[in-house]
């Protein structure tokens, strides 16, 4: 039961390997919904948009108590030899991401390797990074294993309301590998090419930065 499991963890007979599915803030006032909850009567507005959870805290560069994906262990893990099978790929193709993970402690343990993607194309309204893949790997003391992920255009995409479909802008993306959203051990760069480009509309709200980043202006 729960008591036996807690006893095994406290005495070191078992090694924890769970990860937090949410961010623990330092203060309730730091949460994105603080000013909107409990709302007016039965009406509550959710204004976060895509900036939910760790995306909100990352975008505002806010310190947190425990980050998304964080977890405890009686052992330690080292990441090394992170690499891509290609520096560039196109829509319809894929690229593999590989990294070696080693248990450098004295106990068997399980590490959850998390892969985040950061859009560096200049697309507005995207979080600093987004979790796209993860895998749990079991390692004996001193054991090392290679972890592999396959990335496609879908892993770089966001839903574009103007296009009415999922879309990945051509350009550079960062691939971040780590223990949690705030504990990144390796960063790689990959370029994505696609024949379809999002329509660039210039109006009174267009910024100088947006104009300078687009080669069509």
What is each model feature region?
Residues 1-110, 141, 170, 174-178:
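Secreted, periplasmic, or luminal enzymes acting at the cell surface/secretory milieu
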Residues 86, 103-105, 119-121, 153-155, ...:
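Beta-strand elements of well-folded, non-transmembrane domains
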Residues 94-96, 144-148, 185:
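Intrinsic-disorder/low-complexity, polar/charged segments enriched in Ser/Thr/Lys/Arg/Asp/Glu/Gln
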Residues 106-123, 129-131:
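Short acidic, flexible loop segments centered on an aromatic residue
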Residues 123-161:
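Intrinsically disordered, low-complexity Pro/Gly/Ser/Thr-rich segments with frequent PxxP/GP/PP motifs
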Residues 153-198:
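Terminal connector regions
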Residues 194-210:
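Low-complexity, Pro/Ser/Thr- and charge-rich linker/hinge segments at domain boundaries
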Residues 211-217:
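Non-catalytic terminal accessory/regulatory regions of metabolic enzymes
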């Amino acid at each position: 039961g729960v008591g036996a499991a807690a006893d095994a963890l406290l005495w070191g007979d078992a090694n924890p390997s769970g990860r937090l599915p949410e961010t623990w803030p330092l203060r309730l006032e730091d949460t994105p919904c603080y000013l909107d909850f409990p709302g007016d009567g039965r009406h509550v507005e959710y204004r976060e948009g895509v900036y939910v959870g760790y995306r909100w805290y990352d975008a505002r560069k806010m310190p947190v108590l425990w980050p998304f994906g964080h977890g405890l262990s009686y052992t330690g893990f080292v990441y090394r030899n992170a690499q891509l099978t290609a520096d560039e790929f196109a829509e319809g193709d894929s690229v593999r991401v590989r990294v070696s993970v080693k248990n450098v402690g004295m106990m068997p343990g399980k590490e959850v390797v998390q892969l985040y993607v950061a859009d560096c194309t200049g697309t507005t309204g995207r979080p600093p990074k987004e979790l796209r893949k993860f895998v749990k790997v079991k390692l004996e003391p001193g054991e090392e294993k290679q972890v592999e992920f396959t990335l496609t255009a879908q892993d770089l995409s966001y839903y574009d309301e103007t296009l009415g479909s999922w879309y990945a802008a051509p350009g550079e993306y960062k691939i971040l590998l780590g223990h949690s959203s705030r504990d990144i051990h390796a960063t790689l760069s990959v370029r994505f090419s696609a024949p379809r480009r999002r329509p660039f509309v210039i109006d009174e709200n267009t910024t100088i930065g947006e104009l300078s980043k687009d080669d069509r202006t």
